[in-house]
Every structure is written in C-alpha cells, then in structure tokens.
Amino acid sequence: KIGPLTMLDIGGPGMMLAYGVGRIGCQMSGDGDWGIPNLSPKPHWLSWLPDWMWSFNFPHNVNMVDPDNRIPDCVGKFCYALKLPVYPTSFYESVVCLLLFLVLWQLRHKFKAPGVLFGIYMILNGIERFFIELIRVNTRYHLAGISFTQAEMISLILVIGGIGLISYA
C-alpha cells in the first residue's frame, strides 16, 4: 500500500514537468498569459537570443487583443497582434519549470520521509510563480493596504503549505 504523501512525492516532479510543457502551449497560442509591456532594449549580453525571447507582440494570439492592430494581408479569425511588445512570461515559466523539474528529479531519492519532495515542489512552484507575477499582466487586489494578484496569493499559500508539509514530514 502506497501512502498519500508518497503519492504526492511521486507526482511532484511530473507536475512541474507538466506545468513547464503546458506553458509552451500558452506561448504558442498567445492566450493572454503574457507580461507587461517591454520596451527596453535587449541587453547586449543577451544579443545571441532571438528577439521574441526578450519581447514579443504575440501575432495571431487567440485573445484577439488590440483589434485595431490587424496583421496586414492576414485572412482568418486570429489576425491581430499586440501594439506593444510584452515580456513572454509563459516562455520564461516554461524554461524555469523545466529546469525545476530537473532539480526535483535529482532530489527524488535524497529524502526518506514521505511528503518532503512534494513540499519542495510546492515551495519552488510558489517562488517561481511569485516572481513571474512581477512582470505579468493581472488584476491587482487591495486588502489592508497591501496590493497583490490572485497568483501572488496562491504562491504565498504554496510556499507556506510546502514549509508546513516539510515540517510535518
């Protein structure tokens, strides 16, 4: 019989991998999971990267944002691009989550107590998402003088939950 915490440990690395692969779909479709406008020039030390990895206007995005910014000679439903290039946060998340999957994969045999690996997954996922939110477009909420997004709140809960799970294990 496999206990629930062991099952969570088994699933943690796979969940990080799935999240990273899923964000590739967000990048490809331009589903609105993008960052704030990025009008900064690409730093010289990143000059070897394709431009879309620094800022991207998501042509043919499925949200059809900026309807007056139609792509010339485009036929079909998804013929719009963002007026201003934005940070491609879904791409950034994909890269980071795939790297975090490799970290979790390396750690999978290091802990004997059930639940520790999943607790680490929760902490890493929460930290990753919190920092990506700093450059992502999302609705901000205000409570007791504190401004936050829904994802930032979920990130905080993930980190606290992960710490709690590791402490419990």
Q: Could you describe each region identified by the protein language model?
A:
Residues 1-169:
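A feature for loop-to-transmembrane-helix boundaries and adjacent hydrophobic helices
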